Amino acid sequence: MTSFILKRLGFAVVTLVAVLSLVFFIVRILPGDPAMVILGDQANAASIAALRTKLGLDRPMLVQYFVFLSGAVRGDWGVSMVSGRPVIAEVLSVLPNTIELTLVSLVLGVIIGVPAGVWAAVNRNRIPDIVTRVVSLLGLSAPAFVSGIVLLLVFAIALQWFPVISGGQDQSLGGRLRDLALPAVNLALIMAAYVTRVTRSAMLEVLGQDYVRTARAKGIPAGIVIWRHAMRNCLIPVITVIGLYLGILIGNSVLTEIVFNRPGLGKLIVGALTQRDYTMLQGMIVIYTLIVVLVNLITDLTYGLVDPRVQYR
């Protein structure tokens, strides 16, 4: 186990360095000059040159790269080119909102998707199965921003059950839940569609095993056979898809935050892109990469808890 964790941590470090390097050079080749964006089109050449010197943009590309890399290793991600605040402070101020939305959506998606997948598998090729497959296909086909707009039009504008703009002044528990409801449901439905299809496929495979048929032949109630015996053996593919999709879920949460005007990484990313805030973009992508790497490691370690037959090498 220890050697496995150390090996995965080594891979994580290599992945982070590769992502940091890729992000640095991609951000630098984006069109637009941060100094001109900050000062405006009316700024003179001397002011632009002075700001470029202050931001370190007049240095050679490789010098900027090694300064950025050494700072990232020390946990110093620099300061925002626009606000002048430390990047880590800017990111951490909105990160809890994105994590809150992601975790609530994840829990809702699993609560909906796992029972729906089991229900479809038990009723294979019957009406419940057909309905579940059609609904999950719709969930997979609709992009997060499209389904988000539909939810806004129906439940916020037409029915007026929820606020159009999230993150209002009402910070009570009820107000926060109302703000969170539509964005969380939007992401949870997409998550549930993935989980449903994987759970159905895994459960169908397990239900065809000899030990399941033997348990049924002994007269064990169907509910016990499915939830106590079959479910445990189909959890690994379900856990895998949850771990893999969590990274996608964070990306979709960014789009959802933009649609619902919810404070979080989404609005920060849009601002950084439009203002060519290199350091802010780099910091947010580093956070995203760290979360994905950590989730993948936790997913791998969970396999051994679910199935003792899994060996770590």
Predicted segments with their positions:
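Membrane-interfacial helix-loop-helix junctions in multi-pass membrane proteins
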Residues: 53-62, 74-87, 168-180, 187, ...
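Hydrophobic alpha-helical transmembrane segments of membrane transport/permease proteins
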Residues: 15-66, 159-179
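Residue-level marker of structural boundaries
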Residues: 43-44, 56-57, 74, 78, ...
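Alpha-helical transmembrane segments of integral membrane proteins
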Residues: 2-3, 13, 89-130, 144, ...
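An internal, D/E-rich "acidic patch" concept
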Residues: 58-114
